[in-house]
């Protein structure tokens, strides 16, 4: 039954997203809400950037509906797990709301990057408030248990880092959504394996929301008014949800899932490509004494395009690289010592 309900959350999100995105396109074209091309952006023509508005409502509706259905059919969540799950998801919704509203403002009228950064820190602080923070490095660099004085700031830092990694890599069609689809598939499958049904339903609800968007983003045509971008509303909330799922999986909590060596590596493996890219770009900007949050053309997709690849070939190469990292990490986790 749990697998059926998880599948239902996926299907429901796909249907809702496929229903909502065309309506967003209609409104965007009527109100002339477009992403205008410039020297840094690689797209041609005027394209709406409000696709991300559909993400949070669709995911929350699907997750809430299926969770309510679980209780109606008598498939309740264990009391000892509810004690941890309820505050985590309530504070998650608080953080999502902050990023969702700031993303909408940024997509419509613009928002200073300092303000966005402050809101990201505020949203990231919701996780420790819920008792969710990185409390163990599983032997990475010889470190196991972490003090709250180290783990809580590290959690906030990693959350902001992941949010910006997804936001900054959203430069060509299908890249941010494609990397997120891979990450959500991996994390959702891991939660299914450990019978963490609520987290799995959340991951697959998010996955289902992205699939129709990916189609419109990659295969839509600007001249036919069927192409759309996720905008900051989408990339910020998507990064936040991925941070939540990743940190939840990496956190040691025997009430949620069993401890096993290498959990932190497996959890962060799907995000290696965007994380490495944003880390490299930030180093370049710092070395050149440029503002860290001012956009440029140093990202991995820009390098692929400068090398002569088309947008679609660049996306295929980068997504393929992300898949290779995930497979290698999972295949070698039991043979390589974290220490």
Give the location of each predicted region.
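Short aromatic-rich membrane-water interface segments that cap or initiate transmembrane helices
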Residues: 45-48, 81-90, 142-152, 264-267
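Hydrophobic alpha-helical hairpins/lids featuring a short glycine-rich hinge
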Residues: 80-82, 86-122, 127
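Juxtamembrane helix-capping/reentrant segments at transmembrane boundaries
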Residues: 36-50, 226-231
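Alpha-helical transmembrane segments
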Residues: 2-32, 59-72, 77, 81-97, ...
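Membrane-embedded alpha-helical core segments of multi-pass
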Residues: 94-101, 119-130, 154-164, 180-186
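Transmembrane alpha-helix boundary signature
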Residues: 62-79, 100-111, 129-141, 250
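A generic, lipid-embedded transmembrane alpha helix
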Residues: 48-68, 125-129
């Amino acid at each position: 039954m749990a697998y059926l309900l998880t599948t239902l959350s996926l299907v429901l999100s796909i249907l809702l997203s496929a229903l909502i995105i065309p309506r967003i396109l209609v409104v965007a074209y009527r109100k002339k809400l477009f992403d205008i091309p410039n020297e840094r952006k690689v797209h041609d023509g005027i394209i709406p950037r409000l696709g991300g508005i559909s993400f949070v409502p669709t995911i929350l509706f699907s997750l809430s509906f299926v969770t309510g259905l679980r209780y109606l059919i008598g498939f309740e969540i264990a009391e000892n797990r509810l004690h941890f799950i309820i505050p985590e998801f309530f504070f998650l919704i608080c953080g999502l709301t902050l990023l969702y509203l700031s993303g909408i403002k940024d997509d419509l009228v613009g928002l200073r990057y300092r303000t966005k950064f402050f809101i990201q820190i505020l949203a990231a602080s919701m996780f420790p408030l819920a008792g969710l923070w990185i409390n163990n490095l599983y032997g990475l660099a010889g470190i196991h248990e972490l003090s709250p004085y180290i783990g809580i700031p590290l959690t906030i830092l990693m959350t902001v880092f992941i949010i910006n990694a997804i936001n900054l890599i959203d430069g060509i069609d299908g890249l941010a959504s494609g990397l997120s689809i891979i990450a959500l598939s991996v994390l959702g499958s891991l939660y299914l394996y450990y019978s963490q049904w609520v987290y799995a339903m959340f991951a697959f609800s998010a996955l289902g929301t992205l699939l129709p968007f990916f189609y419109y983003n990659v295969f839509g045509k600007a001249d036919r008014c069927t192409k759309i971008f996720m905008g900051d509303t989408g990339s910020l909330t998507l990064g936040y949800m991925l941070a939540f799922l990743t940190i939840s999986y990496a956190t040691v909590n025997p009430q949620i899932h069993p401890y096993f060596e290498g959990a932190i590596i497996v959890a962060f493996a799907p995000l290696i490509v965007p994380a490495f890219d944003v880390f490299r770009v930030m180093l370049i900007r710092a070395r050149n004494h440029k503002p860290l949050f001012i956009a440029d053309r140093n990202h991995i997709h820009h390098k692929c395009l400068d090398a002569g690849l088309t947008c679609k070939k660049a996306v295929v190469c980068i997504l393929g690289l992300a898949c290779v990292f995930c497979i290698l990490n999972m295949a070698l986790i039991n043979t390589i010592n974290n220490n």
